[in-house]
Amino acid sequence: MDRVSKGLIEYLLETINHPDLSGFELIEILDIRSQLAAREPVLSDNDKTELETIDHHLLELADLLVTRISEVADLAQMRKKAHVLPSHWWWYLDEITMRKKKAIG
């Protein structure tokens, strides 16, 4: 794996566990995750496992992330403006949390 990808993965592994991140910092995390998605073909199996760990944390923290991001931006508008692909599901955390809430209650 290249050093850039390794640095991005290490950054995400370190920052994803800090609940005091601002909405702007969380948007940066989503952007970095998209950068890594483009690099997935060149990632090692170990790197892909670490990326799965990051994805698991994103899903676990989805409610908090959506709340914090909504304080500074509208995810739906950001997706539309940036033409985000559905395969970059982390940009759809607002929809994921909404569907989860509907399913529960």
Regions from the PLM with identified roles:
Residues 1-30:
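Short terminal alpha-helical segments
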Residues 26-30, 48-53:
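Short, charged, amphipathic alpha-helical segments
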Residues 7, 11, 31, 35, ...:
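Charged, amphipathic alpha-helical oligomerization/scaffolding segments
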Residues 59-105:
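Amphipathic alpha-helical binding modules
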Residues 25-42:
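Amphipathic, non-membrane alpha-helical rod segments
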Residues 41-45, 60:
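Structural alpha-beta junctions
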